[in-house]
């Protein structure tokens, strides 16, 4: 066996041994590990973090939703138009923004973070009944979705639940956090519909329900990310660089930072947690149907340097885990001789296959370009 084959065999053996424990990265930390195992170690070029010069300090836009869904319909036309302009500008230039005054109660935000942490920190045997990579199940728990396909594993564990359009029952979810997950998902569905309305108007579409009518807000997947303290945070990542498959992602950050967005394809910009705020980013599917007007940008999470775990609750408006033959392409109303289609039409299932098989550090959208 040549050296390359030997390395590959050794790596597969490491991955299988790790998977068989069903305790994830937290299990490694609990065992008292002092060094990051080879399967997690990233090369320096991947870990590099180019920051903008001091004269060019950036922060992602923050948008005040003036109370969220409950108050939006009663906003005066000037306030509403201002919100649409701000969200459209952020979607075109950043692909990322934060929303405040969004209408979701602060106690709900705190309880869902506490629930996700409680799930990951409960007795390992209780978690193991959810450990699976079978995404036909309503709820699964694992470490690294792409454990066996990525070049390197990342320093995090994940729980994942399908909350819409076919919501789980209380029996499908963990007792320690199921109730708050369902409550939070309902709040996020309402907020997501509002954001899709604003984005529809920002695109200049006559119907503010246009994106909702395309089922962009129909499916919701809730993730509970747990980033344990890392003994060597300069040797690995919490989540490697990527774009999201989704139409839209709404992220609740915990108290610890770590999320970074690649701005202008050159500078890594930190997105520190803001109490009560939610981070919103656009996914590949929204870039596709907006014909590139709105952008899906790369982002990552650096390894956790703190002594306590980092919690994150991203919710994806996406059908990626549920096969769909619905066709999506650039919205016809946006096209003209001056703005011809940049992408060909595709089905969700075809695009999901492209996303899963794309080369490292590339976008699946490249394979749809005309």
Swiss-Prot record:
Keyword set, alphabetical order: Iron, Metal-binding, Oxidoreductase
Domain (Fe2OG dioxygenase): residue spans on this chain: 218-320
Keyword Membrane attached: no
EC number: 1.14.-.-
Binding site for 2-oxoglutarate: 310
GO BP, one annotated term: biosynthetic process
Keyword Metal-binding: yes
Class of enzymatic activity (EC top level): oxidoreductase
Name of a matching Pfam family: DIOX_N
Positions with a binding annotation for Fe cation: 242, 244, 299
InterPro entries per UniProt: DIOX_N (IPR026992), IPNS-like_FE2OG_OXY (IPR044861), IPNS-like_sf (IPR027443), Oxoglu/Fe-dep_dioxygenase_dom (IPR005123)
Cofactor: Fe(2+)
One of the record's GO molecular function terms: 1-aminocyclopropane-1-carboxylate oxidase activity
Record note on cofactor: Binds 1 Fe(2+) ion per subunit.
Family: Belongs to the iron/ascorbate-dependent oxidoreductase family.
Protein name (record): 1-aminocyclopropane-1-carboxylate oxidase homolog 8
Organism lineage: Eukaryota, Viridiplantae, Streptophyta, Embryophyta, Tracheophyta
């Amino acid at each position: 066996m040549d050296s390359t084959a030997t390395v590959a065999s050794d790596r597969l053996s490491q991955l299988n041994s790790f998977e068989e424990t069903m305790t994830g990265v937290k299990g490694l930390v609990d065992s008292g590990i002092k060094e990051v195992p080879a399967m997690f170690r990233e090369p320096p070029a991947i870990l590099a973090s180019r920051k903008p010069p001091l004269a060019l300090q950036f922060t992602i836009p923050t948008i005040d939703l003036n109370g969220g869904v409950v108050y939006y319909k009663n906003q005066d036309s000037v306030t509403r138009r201002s919100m649409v302009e701000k969200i459209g500008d952020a979607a075109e230039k950043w692909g990322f923004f934060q929303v405040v005054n969004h209408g979701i109660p602060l106690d709900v935000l705190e309880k869902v973070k506490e629930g996700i942490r409680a799930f990951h920190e409960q007795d390992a045997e209780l978690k193991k009944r959810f450990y699976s990579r079978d995404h036909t199940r309503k709820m699964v728990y694992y470490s690294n979705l792409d454990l066996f396909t990525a070049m390197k594993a990342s320093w995090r564990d994940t729980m994942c639940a399908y909350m819409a359009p076919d919501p789980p029952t209380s029996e499908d979810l963990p007792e320690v956090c199921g109730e708050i997950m369902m409550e939070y998902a309902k709040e996020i569905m309402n907020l997501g519909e509002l954001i899709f309305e604003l984005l529809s108007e920002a695109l200049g579409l006559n119907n503010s329900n246009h994106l909702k009518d395309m089922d962009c807000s129909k499916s919701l997947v809730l993730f509970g990310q747990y980033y344990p303290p890392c003994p060597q945070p300069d040797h690995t990542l919490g989540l490697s660089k990527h774009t999201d498959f989704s139409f839209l992602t709404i992220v609740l950050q915990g108290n610890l930072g770590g999320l970074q967005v690649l701005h202008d394809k050159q500078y890594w910009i930190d997105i520190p947690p803001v109490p009560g705020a939610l981070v919103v980013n656009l996914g590949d599917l929204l870039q596709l149907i907006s014909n590139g007007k709105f952008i899906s940008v790369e982002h990552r999470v650096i390894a956790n340097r703190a002594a306590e775990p980092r919690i994150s609750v991203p919710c994806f408006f996406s059908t990626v885990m549920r096969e769909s033959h619905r066709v999506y392409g650039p919205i016809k109303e946006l096209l003209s001789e001056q703005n011809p289609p940049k992408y060909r039409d595709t089905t969700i299932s075809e695009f999901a296959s492209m996303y899963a098989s794309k080369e490292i550090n590339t976008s699946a959208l490249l394979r749809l370009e005309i």
